[in-house]
Amino acid sequence: ARSQPAKIVMASFGAGTSSHFVGELFKNQAGISMLHVPYKGSAPMMQDLVGGQIPFAVDTSLAAAPQEKGGRIKVLAVSSPKRVANLPDTPTFAELGFQGFDLTAWGALVAPRGLPADVRNALVRALATAMATPAMREDLRKVGVDVLDEPPSAYEARVNRELPAMRALVVRAGMSVD
């Protein structure tokens, strides 16, 4: 990758997506150059990876784990701070020597700004109730999702904490969504 940067492809499931950010952070920390090839989604990217059309891709553990279990790909590392349940034998980037490598995609229930407080609170309570069920937590854990019981204020704090680092990575890597 250092000697022939334009020949090594790093595929993501779209420009500006979490997989693009993970790939750029890897390139930055490894000190290598690769050609970013953004796909229009995970499925076509995974199809090309399995088919041998691309040598390297960044995807979610949810998409990658079944392919690895089927012997079609090899997952090299996960970008979370700890190993994930659906790929328990796969090391983290930190375990491989990439310190401070903590970049995970997270999902949140969002609503329009100005949502009445009573409606917002009812949604938060309903989500917390659903996420607290053992069956829901186990189903999510099996596919590599860690459930965080965070109130809206913690979500806002997470966004405010992570956004500056993501903006800095965009600048450092010269990322573009074009």
What are these regions (language model features)?
Residues 28-32, 69, 95, 117-178:
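An extracytoplasmic/periplasmic, membrane-proximal ligand-sensing/linker region
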Residues 1-44, 93, 106-139:
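Hinge/capping helix and adjacent helix->loop/strand transition within the periplasmic-binding protein
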Residues 25, 29, 43-53, 62-70, ...:
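Short helices/loops that flank or line small-molecule/ion binding pockets
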Residues 64-132, 164:
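C-terminal lobe and pocket-closing loops
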Residues 4-7, 30-32, 50-59, 72-75, ...:
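Alpha-to-beta junction loops
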Residues 39, 58-59, 78, 103, ...:
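Short beta-strand and adjacent tight-turn residues that come in two discontinuous sequence segments
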Residues 5, 73, 104-106, 142, ...:
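Extracytoplasmic
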Residues 10, 36, 58, 75-76, ...:
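Generic preference for hydrophobic
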